[in-house]
A protein has these predicted regions:
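Ferredoxin-reductase
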Residues: 2-89
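FNR/FR-type flavoprotein reductase catalytic core
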Residues: 79-229
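Local cysteine-cluster metal-coordination motifs and their immediate loop/turn environment
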Residues: 126, 205-206, 227-249
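Short, charged beta-turn/beta-strand-edge "cap" motif at the junction between a beta-strand
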Residues: 43-47, 97-102, 246
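Alpha-helix termini
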Residues: 62-64, 189-195, 245-247
Length: 249
């Protein structure tokens, strides 16, 4: 874990209220794993004082495959992310990371069934890196991407560039299935019945609950990444606590 003052190296707007910030920091990049996040300051002043948690979107590598930087895929949801959207190349922010518990991904010596990535909204951010790592290890991957509208869909092109089959759902029916992303997932499981499938999910709480119910019903392993506001990023302040079967965690 490192605490660094970093210059923003790139800014790309990818949709309404959606943007990507790029940073160079070999120390953080070399330790990033799929599912890690960083805590990033949003203003030079103390208002707002708390940093915001952002999932690692992609790890940047040079010609020799050495990690040298990382990107964050961000959606404006409040004053903090709105301030980040106003940042320009060359602006500086404080970044603490990598933080969190990464996804537990199988290696090449344990090739399993199909890995199904289920995501909604900005919960899509960690999954291109998940897919990339699984594909490197020879695993089969399929993505289910949901959003309110076609404009709000994230990471679909990332998956297609990786050769990952993608099923899309939008609340308003403007692209793909008209409805919630769990319905294409359920339909796929019912029609294909993939043996030894593994589920991964990140997105709105109702979506996560629905994926959990599917996993429980079908006795499929499930890993989740929670979207939660937090103050410290390391579990000390307890603001990110969620209730699990074994108690709060």
């Amino acid at each position: 874990m490192y605490d660094r003052r970093l210059a923003i190296e790139s800014v790309a707007h990818v949709g309404p209220g959606q943007f990507i910030l790029g940073f160079e920091c070999p120390e953080i990049a070399s330790q990033c794993r799929p599912g890690h996040f960083v805590m990033i300051s949003v203003a030079e002043s103390i208002d707002p004082i708390l940093r915001r948690p952002m999932a690692i979107y992609r790890v940047l590598r040079d010609a020799s495959n050495t990690p040298y930087g990382f990107t964050l895929l961000i959606e404006v949801v409040g004053c903090g992310t709105a301030l980040l959207e106003q940042k320009s190349v060359g602006d500086h922010v404080e970044v603490l990371g990598p933080l969190g518990v990464p996804f537990s991904l199988p290696t090449t010596d344990r090739v399993s069934g199909e890995h199904l990535l289920v995501m909604g909204g900005v919960g899509s951010a960690p999954f291109p890196l998940v897919a990339e790592e699984l594909l490197k290890s020879g695993h089969r991957v399929r993505a289910f991407v949901g959003a309110r509208t076609a404009e709000a869909l994230l990471c679909v092109d990332d998956f297609r560039e990786l050769g990952v089959p993608v099923e899309v759902a939008t609340d308003d029916g403007s692209e793909g299935f008209h409805g919630y992303v769990v319905h294409p997932l359920q339909g796929y499981l019912e029609s294909e019945d993939p043996a030894n499938a593994v589920l991964y999910a990140c997105g709105p709480t109702p979506m996560m609950r629905a994926v959990h119910e599917i996993a429980m019903t079908r006795n499929l392993p499930l890993q989740v990444s929670f979207e939660a506001p937090m103050a410290c990023g390391i579990g000390v302040c307890l603001s990110c606590v969620v209730c699990v079967d074994a108690g709060d965690n």
